[in-house]
Amino acid sequence: MSILTSPRGKVEVVHCRRTESQDIFCIKNLVRKFTQKLFGRLNIIYLLEKANLAVTVCNDKEEIMAHSIFLDYPNWNVAKQDNWIPLFRELDKEIPCTPLNTLFMHFFVAVDEYATGCLKEIIRTVFKAVPELYFIFLIVPTYLSLGSTLITVFDQVGNIPCLNYNEDFAVHICHRHNHYPQLHIRKARVEDHDDLMPIFMHYDNTLKEIYGEYFLAELIEAQDKDHHAVVCEVEGKAVGFMSVCTSVNLPLLHECFDLGPFHGFCTPHPDDILKPSREPSLEEGEEKHLKKCSTSLIIREMQIKTTLRFHLTPVRMAKIKNSETETSASCEEALPTVLGLVSEERLKQDMEKNLSILSLVDEEDVASSLSSSLLLSVESSHFRPLYLGDPIAFCIQLFCIDERYEARQVLISNVSLSLDFMSFVFSLFPGKNFCLISVPHLTPEFVLIQNFVKVVPFNNCTLDHDLYVFHRAGLLRSITIRLAKFLDTAGVEKLVSTLLLSTKILDDLAQYNEAGRDPDGTALQVFVAEVADQIVGIAVIRKEMDIEYIRSHYNIEDFIYFSHHQQEEHGRLNHFALNPIFRHYTKFFLKEILRLGYKSCLYYPVYPQTREGKLQSSYSHSLTSALHYLVPVRPRRQIVYPLEKLGINAPSKEVSKDQVSFALNHTNRKLTLEPKVTVNARIVVVGASSVGISFLETLVFCSHLKFNNLTLISTHGLPGKRLLHNEQRKFLASDHCFNDKDYALMSLCSWVNVVVGRMTAIDRAAKQVVVSKSEIVFYDHLILCTGLQYQVPCPTGADTEQHLTNREVLELSKQRYTGTVPSNLFILNDEEDCVRMLCWLRNSSILTEGKVIVYGNTLDAYTTVETLLNIGMKGSGIYFVHPPTESNITCINNNDVESAVEDALSAAGVTVFHDALLAQWNHGQHPDPIYNACFTTSTKPIRLECSAFFSFYKKNVDYETFKAFNDACLVYDGRLVIDTTFHTNDIAIRAAGSLTKFSNRYYSNEWTHSNFSSKEIGFQLAAAMLSLFDPTLEPVTEPPADLDRLIPMYKGAKIQGGILPGSYHYLHISKPAIPTPLNLQRSQPDFGSDVVTGNAKKGTYFRLYINNYKLVEAITCFSKEPFPSSNYIRLFGQHEQVLNNLCTRFDDKLIPDLYSYFTEPWCMALFHDRFIDLKKELRQILISKQEEDKPTMEEIAYRLEEEEINLNEKPQKYLQRVFEDSIYKSLLEKSILDYLHYNQYHLPMYAWPGII
């Protein structure tokens, strides 16, 4: 906030922010004729799309006071955007302008009264937002003066000609030091104490309480060769302090962090022990097989993830060689000794001697090492390398700076005469190459550490701090990005020699040098990063050929106005490799690629792994260290088109083609200077349920946040491995929250650490989760989303020889089975269980001659019976046993559908038993393996022979999970108890999903999260937590205690579906509700109407339930033919009139088949992902006041409802007539036509004015 005063004495409180699209209208109103003379006639929207930085000044009423746009190349076409540097260097050789430290002002407008103050505020904001920036150039025609405003900050440095026409332009410059304090770094003196103490006390008085009032003076006085205190001062006043020393607890760091990439912060020594001695016991026999299977089936997702994050974080920056000799040699080369003051020239000389200070890492090594370390069941002993060389690291003990000057603390980009902290402190320790700092996890990332590299901790790290490291060579600031040439080949080979796809990168480099394009004609560009005449980075981009597919399948328009970007301005990032020392230049590298390559957008796809466990598909995209500097783009929900029926009105093949799914990441010119808020809080999610996945998805796709410590603990890792080939035959029913394609489109493995194992304990005091009884995962926020699982059924033990009935037997469904678990008992809870069972079946003779029992009455039991029939099992070999139910509500809850399923089971020869309670296995003898099972019924007992037993009898909380809750003293009452904000009785532990129940104080035991959509629950859980991390959100205020009495009600549809016996495709969609028999619902006085077509037994059944508000509240589809489930899910909640007056047409017998009805061209817009946005826009028009003297349509409707208007006609007709005569009709029509026009690539079947 700043206060501006106009010449007339008016005062405005203003603040600066990034420009938003809704500012454009107000910005245009500020344009004057003089503005157009200075900057030309500009398309503001287009310019904003291509700007690197746009700043708007607002007052406290959010009225726009000023606006300015900055780009990284000159305006007025005085130079090409990729070659302006020589021209500006010639103007004044004393101005060392580079693409790194220079921006150009392309536009400025302001309210006249406050123009000068607003301009200075913008300039200060820009310098603060871009610490590397030192020069801002302004170019105007020579015949124009700058005016009274711009001349206050810009000075002329010369004239240059225009490329296009015969006219000269004046070049003006604005220097950082004129508008932002110049910091001077020096050794601290005792006299600085009085300046520094108020800064320390502003943040915390802990140090004063522990060490006394004069701790700072004592620290300054205690300086020696190993301890130094440094201050930065502005105008003679100390405003920042740093204490550094060589006392580093390296043994502790070795135990807690992976220091291998940095050679333990020691000089290489011949006796270093870098590899454990070979222990073949873990590599041979059964354990070798387990590791192989685990890698391919359980943690394959971690291989992509770890490699991506390794470069990014980066974790391993030096490839550990195979022998100690090689290691010593490589490390000697990798760690040069930089002596004396850190001058640019000296650093260049060191770089010329040996570039490989820290080399890139082979993705395969990374993936295999992390995969094995995270696979808890096969993790090797905690070997730590032994480094015998001299320590070459010092640490920052204490750091504090006045927040007004914090943004000035740049580590690598000072070209001013004074040196910043890092250059100065390295000069104090000429024999040290690494600077370390540890920061508590929950500390927001401050400017000082943004250019440090975060060191990855080991699994068993007990420190509650993150460790960051900065290498001396990172002070080099003369980095140049340019197009590659033939002479770069040797340098690139050295850079990428350890990368998995190094050959492909070198092939692309050779292809570019030879032809500049691929053999198929696709434009190809290769850029290199150069420091001290050495290649330190390479990027390969191609013209994006699938841009229409990307636009139609991903929400890329969340980040760009697509129509303002030309086809050739879209590029695909195929490879990106940068020496980790210069990781802080990644965004600059990307910005230069866009400038030099004449691109405005870059896309980077992450393909899912194949079943064989390859790191990437064969699409030749190497894993990139730039991933975390890109933003993940949400996939768009696609319409399933009836292509044959649409004919020539179907979308183009570019839109409708079925490609291999991939997750898309993106950057553009606007994002190159857009900061991300780093969140280091350790967020641990237990359970890969739909709730947990939805929670992680919501966090990952917050594009302005970067979560560094997301961890998922799951028995089988991330789902979505496509383990079952046939998508149409799943053993388990689906809740339609996520499928394999969704997982591929999200690529959570790129952002989430995955720990494969089972939670067995929670230590709330230490904030740690015990996994698989031995390993520890620390947390700051623990999210419990384990859900409910089918459990091993507990036989009642009833003696069937005594002919007991269910009434005479004690029901033990809630009792835990503690006996031997039979090897042929299958409890199917996820796809991994199904795969294991399927392998067992196919390796036995059961499919052809055995008998199986399917015990349960859930939808999963029905889909399993159908899948068994489908894979070749005879119906006569399947016993389908329904246990007694506690209510008269079935899992299908539709008599027509149930009757058709029963007939299909009978036709297939499946024997069905009802109300049968499991009594014994093997007559009460040893149960492994099961060869028969006895059941009691309401009449007489039954005994069934079997070769396998499938149990789907009642889901419950896993016992180990329950024990972890109970031992941790979390309140548990049949389910884990939570409040309305997902909190358990521990503020750091939240829970959600079917695992939970609301506290009894809400008096709502019948409502739990099980009644709602799991995907919506996960989203709401994430939304509740984001206020803790997202500075753009208002803090959530807790409601008064007496108001916290109502549970939240969510509106998302509850969905279940699958393939039922008889090969019937089944889908049921309903609103969240307490389950009630359908017949009872129909008997209620407020029941709406059913719209039903077809016959269940013929497989043509389609039911829509329209409530008394004429909204679709339930949908049931039951068909022999596959149908587009995702389309029908969009019908939920729609008004019947939106469905083309469905009820009227149905009553008039005009809709014989709803399946056919919803394949007609008119309804495609209903299935469009942006149809909901159109509805919101139309509603906003109706409730907004369009004419001063007339009420809105909403106000008229309210008056009718309150009977304030006397009518001689029906209210609906009156509303219709008023609407027809008002301006609202034309506004709505325009909005609808604009929607159809803008989305015509998805909806070409509709006519719009441009094609009429």
UniProtKB/Swiss-Prot annotation:
Pfam family of this protein, just one?
A: CFAP61_N
- Phenotype of null mutants: CFAP61-null male mice are infertile. The epididymis contains fewer spermatozoa in the cauda and caput regions compared to wild-type animals, and spermatozoa exhibit short, bent, curled, thick or missing flagella, and are immobile. Acrosome morphology is normal. The length and motility of respiratory tract cilia is also normal.
| SUPFAM superfamilies according to UniProt | Acyl-CoA N-acyltransferases (Nat), FAD/NAD(P)-binding domain
Q: Name one GO biological process term.
A: cilium movement
How is this protein annotated for GO cellular component? axoneme; motile cilium; radial spoke; radial spoke stalk; sperm flagellum
Q: What is its main location?
A: cytoplasm
Superkingdom: Eukaryota
The record's subcellular locations are: Cytoplasm, Cytoskeleton, Flagellum axoneme
Q: Which UniProt keywords apply?
A: Cell projection, Cilium, Cytoplasm, Cytoskeleton, Flagellum
Entry keyword annotation includes Cytoplasm: yes
As annotated in Swiss-Prot or TrEMBL, what is the tissue specificity of this protein?
Answer: Expressed in testis, brain and lung; the expression in testis is higher than that in other organs. Detected in spermatozoa in seminiferous tubules (at protein level). Not detected in the respiratory tract cilia.
**Keyword Flavoprotein annotated:** no
Q: What does this protein do?
A: Involved in sperm flagellum assembly. Plays an essential role in the formation of the radial spokes in flagellum axoneme.
Assembly and interactions?
Answer: Component of axonemal radial spokes, the protein complexes that link the outer microtubule doublets with the central pair of microtubules. Interacts with CFAP91/MAATS1, ODAD2/ARMC4, RSPH3A, ROPN1, ROPN1L and RSPH9. Interacts with DYNLT1, DYNC1I2 and TUBB3. Interacts with WDR35, IFT22 and IFT81.
The protein depicted here goes by the name Cilia- and flagella-associated protein 61
Q: Which species does this protein come from? A: Mus musculus
